[in-house]
Amino acid sequence: MFRTLLTLTLLLVALPVGAKEAEVIVYGATPGGFCAAIAAAREGAQVILLEPTSHVGGLSTGGLSHCDSNQMRRESLTGLFEEWHRRIAKDYVDRGEPVPYDPKDKTAGIRWVFEPHVALRVTQAMLQEAGVTVVTDCQLTSVQMAGTRIAGLRTSQGAFTAKTYIDGTYEGDLMAGAGVSWVIGREGRADYGEALAGKRYPKPTMAIDGFDATGRPLPLVTGVDAGAEEAGDRNVMTFSFRLCLTRDPANLVPIPQPANYDSAKFELARRALKAGVRGIGFDLYPLPGKKLDGNNSIYGQVSLGLVGGSNTWHAADAAERARLWEAHKQYTLEFLHFLRTDPAVPAKTRADYASLGFCKDEFAATAHFPPALYVRESRRLHGLYILSQKDIIDSPAKDDPIAISSFPIDSHDCQRVALKGGGVVNEGTILPVRVPGTGVGYAYQVPYRAILPRPEQCGNLLVPVALGSTHVAMSSLRIEGAWMAIGQGAGVAAALSAKRGLNVQDLPYPELRTRLLAQGQTVELPTPPIRKAAPKAAEKPPATSPAGLILDDQVAELEGAWTPSTNFKPHIGKGYVHDEQRSDGKCRATFRFKVPTEDDYELGMAYSAHATRTTRLPITIAGGGVEHRLTVDQTQPLPAGESFRPLGQFRLRPGVDYTLTLSNEGTVGFVILDAFQLRPTGTTAPKPR
């Protein structure tokens, strides 16, 4: 339904004398692209890496600094991905700085975080050491075909020719220029039998009027009809920037006020805040150097993503993409200005956002604004194999694997619809689909066939980034770690094909597999992850004196989709769980306990305080016909040097079955469940006479 062919002119004339030659040309220096280039060069191929912008590394060096591998099977992410992270850690060691993470610790949930300029330095060093020639500001203008093979490329930096080509762009620009079939948008549920396809409405409808006084949809609304629920369409998930921010005065650059700011653009957000709608803002992840990674909130209602602004990006020429890039930047600066200044935003929230600035030591060439737009999804190859939901969840094994992917299926908004009967709803989000009882996605093998065009269309092109997949499958594949691994597979295949003069479809898989393993790539599926079942209540929770009773999340009865994590330290026990900001009332935890003596017990709570946490977590202690209710602001720090924050004192008696319950009903932000402490204060009851 969405298949389209040529967007660039196919040249059938010879390239000019002086065309730069290589055995392998990679177009697009994304993570998949630069790993493909390095892998090909390490196989002995002469490699040229062409990048249409001035920025090398895509999102991995352009602001996405909270590595999404925390939700993946890291033990299967080896090869260049692992080496890249080892070298990032070594960069900190060599400079005498604290190491932000240990790449040897593959435990899911642990944060692997870094600063953008460190990631760029490591990427450039690896490319240089491999002998890759890098050409930036090199925009593709046309493709020369000789039958079913690419003969050469014309670019803004001259002509280039190679034996084998790799499309490393997020957009699939080279495959489109070569006349290879591709798709855009979303499939219907019947197309590949995907339950997650079609329209998606996981977020609550905002109880606001989505129209202005004249009856027109408000700004930031994309339409009034999302289309048939079972059907696909040409929408792609929203794009945004990954901001690198700080509150450190020594490194803070003030965020500039946007030119031509129109407060009316955010009337939808203003109405939502007035109606008590949660999720107006964006996520912040801590980074080294007192920095923060700002991301579009997948659970949010209005966030950094310009919903609807991504749909024409794939077909735009260089000038139009520059205009769309500026439109996304303008929206980002305007949204930041709205959050920092608009009276509709609660004062505390305004102050929190107003304390943020750009980082003086990041992205100096672009005035400290990120150089790379987060193109989460664009064209997708329609080649020899199409990965779908079934390949991820039901049939993960393949005969010709080149990499293992395991990020949860996870899509951001595609539409924002004003309902004629009242209300505004975001459509298109697929909330993370993980293996139940774990914090990771399903592991599956990515087949070599998924990066191959049909041989009758092109015999010397590999497509590891815009690879063959449905929208649902791309919602899992679209992560830098997966693209790095798939790119490495493409690079090895390209070098082998070039050396032997083969079409990429004719390369014997056993030969490819041998060289992939030699480069440290993992192609075998990992053992299934250990699922964390909802634990039963302990008959007697661990007790210490004078610490009292410790109620760890491990002994709670959990209901709903809690996610285990060890991202933030310190924590009590093996880790903690959180609700992924669902705010749906379905995440509930119950502790059952008894106390040994009658006393006034001080209740303390362990959690990792952060600006992204909920400010109103409801907690109830009940037993013996008495009930105590309280709310906890998890943005508030714990007392210095303490593991628990005191919440209050409660009179408890022995022999009574008590319950302590909490839920994410009515919460805004992450709910963190680590542990509680019940510490006797020594105020015992007098003995009966």
Descriptions of predicted regions:
Residues 33:
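N-terminal Rossmann-fold NAD(P) dinucleotide-binding loop
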Residues 20-30:
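Beta1/beta-strand and adjacent pyrophosphate-binding region of the FAD-binding site
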Residues 15-19:
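Sec/Tat signal peptide C-region and signal peptidase I cleavage site
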Residues 539-689:
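Extracytoplasmic
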Residues 120, 158, 162-164, 168-539:
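Flavin (FAD/FMN)-binding glycine-rich loop and adjacent Rossmann-like elements that form
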Residues 144-159:
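Conserved beta-strand-loop-beta-strand element in the redox core of flavoprotein oxidoreductases
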Residues 5-14:
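Bacterial N-terminal signal peptides
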Residues 45-46, 51-142, 146, 183, ...:
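Conserved N-terminal/central alpha/beta ligand/cofactor-binding core
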